[in-house]
């Protein structure tokens, strides 16, 4: 029986240094998606884009941070055919198809002081609506719960309705709206 897209298997694991090129690729894809939906979205600087691998490497170094990735295959390995009639070969390393960054932040001016923040959540288009973001988010929630973090926050763009729908299905509720304007636009408005 042919495998359907919905039945594809994946596993979630903590990102490693070997994943850095794919983390960079996925973050740039996220930026491209958001800019494609609304060119007013803030862009990553060229310097940050060039240094994304180092940026993610520094995030991975800290114990209060995690980057989780989704890997094709039940155990993170997707069999590759060797040829007609031969057994498949397990690759030594499978490339991620999704990512999610979660950090524990401390701010003594807020209550709760310690909270979680999710950033840079991405699933490659062919893996969407397959439960991958649910798996990544559950991994982040487990990480936070083990560290007794009681609240987690994230941002999603208004111009990306699928993202808002996804996050709300995962239990996030919109509590605040951020507004953006140029000073010139503000000054040019009539009362």
Name the predicted role of every residue range:
Residues 1-21, 188-191:
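Conserved N-terminal entry element of GNAT/NAT acetyltransferase domains
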Residues 28-55:
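Conserved GNAT-fold acetyl-CoA-binding loop/helix
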Residues 51-69, 117:
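A short helix-loop-beta-strand connector motif used in the catalytic cores of GNAT acetyltransferases and
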Residues 69, 94-104, 117, 122:
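Conserved beta-strand in the GNAT
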Residues 112-125, 177-180:
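Conserved acetyl-CoA binding element of GNAT-fold acetyltransferases
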Residues 120-123, 129-142, 169:
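Conserved acetyl-CoA-binding loop-helix of GNAT-fold acetyltransferases
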Residues 134, 146, 158-176, 187:
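Conserved active-site alpha-helix within GNAT-family acetyltransferase domains
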Residues 144-156:
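Conserved GNAT acetyl-CoA-binding A-motif
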